[in-house]
Swiss-Prot record:
GO terms for biological process: arginine biosynthetic process via ornithine; L-arginine biosynthetic process. The gene is argB. Substrate binds at residues 70-71, 92, 191. This is Acetylglutamate kinase. Catalyzes the ATP-dependent phosphorylation of N-acetyl-L-glutamate. GO terms for cellular component: cytoplasm. The record marks 35, 252 as: Transition state stabilizer. Pathway: Amino-acid biosynthesis; L-arginine biosynthesis; N(2)-acetyl-L-ornithine from L-glutamate: step 2/4. Belongs to the acetylglutamate kinase family. ArgB subfamily. GO terms for molecular function: acetylglutamate kinase activity; ATP binding. Keywords: Amino-acid biosynthesis, Arginine biosynthesis, ATP-binding, Cytoplasm, Kinase, Nucleotide-binding, Transferase.
Length: 295
């Protein structure tokens, strides 16, 4: 028990634990897809807390599926190797050389580190990529920059999901840790935005929830007015709000809209800078961050 919990009165501890019961019952046996990113995957304390949360969910009979990116780590490795990097329209221009680095970093570094952190709690996590068992099929995408359609190289969207491999891991009570690399129909591998991939996977798995870890407290209807933080919003309202959001938040909101519109009961934008934010969101009445529901 940490010093922070030791300082709490016994009655408060009891109330928190009792409050979790209906949520534990509701989520038992259900799939929860978590997009892991931001400070939660670069700060050592937060990384360990996230891994513990995944083990906690698994031991409560809930099925977590983790989808991760690795933008900062890819940038650092490109710099270390002396490979120039460029961004257009908010996306990394991905040459074959850059893709080789992305594959090495996403699956060989970021994914491995998270798998090992989770497995410190037991033999739970298994790392896979969208290349494994045809999990994802990619389709190449472009971006619009100043009104001009612009090629950004080997960057894709998810065209199809074959969830069989992930479902097999879930049936074996493993925790899938998914790196978002995927081949197109011709076998050419692309890097896929992790927010997009998480939403597509949540839809294909029939997940109960999609959680998006960010570096903000949730969704603000009028940023930077911190009083505009909303605890719940429906898809119709959020769709209207989308054009006004900060650029970095748009892919996350689009992912939430896609998942909920496809039948996932709720998507949640939560603050990954808070230790055990996943547990707070799932097992307390007030939760944390912003919950997105169908209109």
């Amino acid at each position: 028990m940490t010093p922070s919990t030791e300082a709490l009165p016994t009655a408060v501890k009891a109330q928190v634990l009792a409050e979790a019961l209906p949520w534990l019952k509701q989520l038992h046996g259900k799939i929860v897809v978590i997009k892991y990113g931001g400070n939660a995957m670069t700060d050592d304390t937060l990384r360990r807390a996230f891994a513990a949360d995944m083990a906690f969910l698994r031991n409560c009979g809930i099925h977590p599926v983790v989808v991760h990116g690795g933008g900062p780590q890819i940038t650092a490795m490109l710099r270390r190797l002396g490979i120039p990097g460029d961004f257009k329209g908010g996306f990394r221009v991905t040459t074959p050389e850059v893709l080789d680095v992305a594959r090495m970093v996403l699956f060989g570094q970021v994914g491995r580190e998270l798998v090992n952190l989770i497995n410190a709690h037991g033999p739970y996590a298994v790392g896979i990529t969208g290349e494994d068992a045809q999990l994802f099929t990619a389709v190449r995408r472009s971006v619009t920059v100043d009104g001009v359609t612009t090629d950004i190289g080997l960057v894709g969207d998810v065209e199809r999901v074959n969830a069989a491999a992930v479902l097999d891991l879930i049936a074996a009570r493993r925790i899938p840790v998914v790196s978002t690399l995927a081949p197109d129909a011709e076998g050419v591998v692309h890097n896929i935005n992790a927010d997009t991939a998480a939403a597509a996977l949540a839809e294909a798995l029939g997940a109960e929830k999609l959680l998006m870890l960010t570096d903000v407290e949730g969704l603000y209807t009028s940023w930077p007015n911190r009083d505009s933080l909303v605890s719940e919003i429906d898809t119709a309202t959020l769709s209207q709000l989308l054009p006004t959001l900060e650029a970095g938040m748009i892919p996350k909101v689009e992912a939430c809209l896609r998942a909920v519109s496809a039948g996932v009961p709720s998507a949640h934008v939560i603050d990954g800078r808070v230790e055990h934010c996943v547990l707070v969101e799932l097992f307390t009445d007030a939760g944390t961050g912003t919950k997105v529901v169908s209109s």
